């Protein structure tokens, strides 16, 4: 079981709700994935409609909602968005996202740290999206974030685990869960992150933009489970030279 804040999760695959062609397909894909936590932008939710097309299928399936602060350009905007989400959705969980550059959507480390400090003081369970920066992730942990969410590659790029070396350091030194977020474009990418020791991954575009999102969701579920199983089993170490699996020297000497 994965514990973050006051919740426990059987599934280590977290999902997003954007880019699906319709809410029914979104709900089916998330349900098939086994995900128990789905992130969503507050701007996509009609907080005055209790039968909101996005919310209801997820709530009915028992999926926990993780509102994000997507669109915030600074700490002040992010704190305000989080407060709105808490009031509208009744949750103190928030995925902290601050990316002022609309082209590359790179997270602002300075504003993210400032917002995280304020939100933790205000009683939020904060999961910050950030660069794969070991120093920053440690600082976010120290100010009280419940987990850290370093990027694998730019949002929506599907480039996979481009920040591998830095993620290894983050995972090694973290005392809170590490959720690899952004850039995961194939089930193999998710498996690789889990094999490294990541506690979970968050996937959106790779599922939502697939030709068959439901089938892809199942593929990601299996990849995350197998990657976690491999990590726990203990991967064989790498060496720089060949090591025969069936040495023949003694056998040949006897001929």
Curated annotation (Swiss-Prot):
HAMAP family: ThiG. The lineage of its organism: Bacteria, Pseudomonadati, Pseudomonadota, Gammaproteobacteria, Vibrionales. It is found in: Cytoplasm. It comes from the Bacteria. The active site is at 95 (schiff-base intermediate with dxp). InterPro entries: Aldolase_TIM, Thiazole_synthase_ThiG, ThiG. 1-deoxy-D-xylulose 5-phosphate binds at residues 156, 182-183, 204-205. Its EC number is 2.8.1.10. Homotetramer. Forms heterodimers with either ThiH or ThiS. The gene is thiG. Gene3D superfamilies: Aldolase class I. Catalyzes the rearrangement of 1-deoxy-D-xylulose 5-phosphate (DXP) to produce the thiazole phosphate moiety of thiamine. Sulfur is provided by the thiocarboxylate moiety of the carrier protein ThiS. In vitro, sulfur can be provided by H(2)S. SUPFAM superfamilies: ThiG-like. GO terms for molecular function: thiazole synthase activity. GO terms for biological process: thiamine diphosphate biosynthetic process. It catalyses: [ThiS sulfur-carrier protein]-C-terminal-Gly-aminoethanethioate + 2-iminoacetate + 1-deoxy-D-xylulose 5-phosphate = [ThiS sulfur-carrier protein]-C-terminal Gly-Gly + 2-[(2R,5Z)-2-carboxy-4-methylthiazol-5(2H)-ylidene]ethyl phosphate + 2 H2O + H(+). The keyword RNA-binding does not apply. Pathway: Cofactor biosynthesis; thiamine diphosphate biosynthesis. Transmembrane segments: none annotated. Keywords: Cytoplasm, Schiff base, Thiamine biosynthesis, Transferase. The keyword DNA repair does not apply. This is Thiazole synthase. Pfam families: ThiG. Belongs to the ThiG family. It comes from Vibrio parahaemolyticus serotype O3:K6 (strain RIMD 2210633).
């Amino acid at each position: 079981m994965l514990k973050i804040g006051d919740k426990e999760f059987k599934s280590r695959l977290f999902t997003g709700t954007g880019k699906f062609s319709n809410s029914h397909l979104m709900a089916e894909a998330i349900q098939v994935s086994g995900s128990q936590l789905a992130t969503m932008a507050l701007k996509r939710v009609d907080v005055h409609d209790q039968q909101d097309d996005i919310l209801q299928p997820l709530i009915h399936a028992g999926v926990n909602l993780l509102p994000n602060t997507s669109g915030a350009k600074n700490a002040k905007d992010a704190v305000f968005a989080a407060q709105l989400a808490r009031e509208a959705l009744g949750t103190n969980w928030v995925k902290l996202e601050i990316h002022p550059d609309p082209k590359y959507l790179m997270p602002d480390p300075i504003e993210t740290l400032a917002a995280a400090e304020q939100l933790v003081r205000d009683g939020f369970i904060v999961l910050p999206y950030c660069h794969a920066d070991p120093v920053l992730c440690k600082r976010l942990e120290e100010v009280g974030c419940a987990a850290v969410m370093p990027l694998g590659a730019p949002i929506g790029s599907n480039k996979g685990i481009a920040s591998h070396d830095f993620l290894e350091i983050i995972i090694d030194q973290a005392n809170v869960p590490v959720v690899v977020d952004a850039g995961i474009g194939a089930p193999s990418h998710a498996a690789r992150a889990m094999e490294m020791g990541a506690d979970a991954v968050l996937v959106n575009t790779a599922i939502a933009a697939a030709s068959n999102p439901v089938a892809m969701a199942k593929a990601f579920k299996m990849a995350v489970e197998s990657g976690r199983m491999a990590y726990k089993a203990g991967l064989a170490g790498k060496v720089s030279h060949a090591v025969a699996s069936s040495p023949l020297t003694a056998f040949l000497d006897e001929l």
